[in-house]
């Protein structure tokens, strides 16, 4: 009788812990860092690690510290959405410290190929490839789909259209991610013309979460874009010095969207079978 009671007590004590461990095993963590008006999203399920953009040059150490805190020792996929300094600046730091299995970058030549951030990025990538620290590099023109465990990635380029003569923000890769029924969209810095093209081409799909394009800068196609995406959550990468535009915030409020600003701190996103949880 005593043995039976002890067994029941042990079973009751262990079951919640096992459930918690199972939930932790299936959890995807996404950190959108507070690094001013710059982009860096770190994504990991504990096995696969993805980094989307790398902030400014001075952000490299902070990005590295955030990755270390998440237990990341190598990068499976490093995705550069476009070649502005607030998206590639920290890449040399990451390419020197971490082994990168695959780097994906946009297939265009920036207006200024002599810009310090771009030259530093190219030099660091060349060195990483020569030293075997970057397994492969792919310039994405059309689209690339990848599936790793419970993570599905789709990376969309411009399908050969070159916007760089006018505004290379529009050459941004747009990254969508699915995990256990939860959907996320990282829209780089796309602006009015690219949004117009993507809407007309049917390349905008609904999702649960949106990293708002171009740091919350308003344009007249955002309302149509937000309506099509129909997200529940949004994050804007901005700073007190360079805040999101009020018109953009008003559109998000009108959509009933729960909006986070990185000027208020790093955004912590957790995706599980139960849904999406976001804290700041």
Regions found by a protein language model. Name each.
Residues 11-280:
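Non-globular, low-confidence helical/coil segments that flank catalytic cores
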Residues 1-12:
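Sec-dependent bacterial lipoprotein signal peptides
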